[in-house]
């Protein structure tokens, strides 16, 4: 199997650290997916999105999640996020403790060069 970097140097991750109301984790996932997979998700229509986000659940706390995605332009992500919060107001946000759905942004500053990954894969 060919190895590929998780993300590209110079791009950005958005990292949401989400704690939902106690006992509401499964409901959160259901409502999140309803919005994320729906026709009303402007994030998926942006050319600035490189890879679609993934929602991860903490293995030790069923009400704790991380949402991570790769973007070329965090200003565009921020603009869309603010529009979604103001105009669309997805139902899943109501389940987040404190009601805040704001990520940290991280610049990707290093990645393994493809030739190194290819060499490792060839050695298998």
Tell me the role of every PLM-derived stretch.
Residues 62-64:
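A generic structural signal for beta-strand entry/edge sites
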Residues 6-7, 104-124:
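Acidic/histidine-enriched, glycine/proline-rich intrinsically disordered or flexible terminal extensions
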């Amino acid at each position: 199997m060919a190895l590929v970097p998780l993300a590209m140097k110079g791009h950005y991750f958005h990292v949401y650290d989400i704690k939902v109301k106690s006992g509401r984790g499964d409901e959160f996932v259901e409502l999140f997916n309803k919005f994320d997979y729906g026709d009303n998700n402007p994030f998926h229509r942006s050319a600035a999105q490189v890879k679609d986000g993934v929602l991860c659940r903490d293995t030790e706390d069923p009400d704790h999640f991380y949402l991570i995605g790769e973007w070329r332009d965090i200003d565009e992500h921020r603009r869309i996020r603010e529009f979604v919060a103001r105009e669309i107001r997805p139902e899943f946000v109501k389940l987040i403790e404190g009601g805040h759905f704001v990520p940290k942004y991280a610049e990707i500053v290093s990645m393994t060069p493809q030739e190194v990954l290819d060499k490792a894969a060839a050695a298998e």
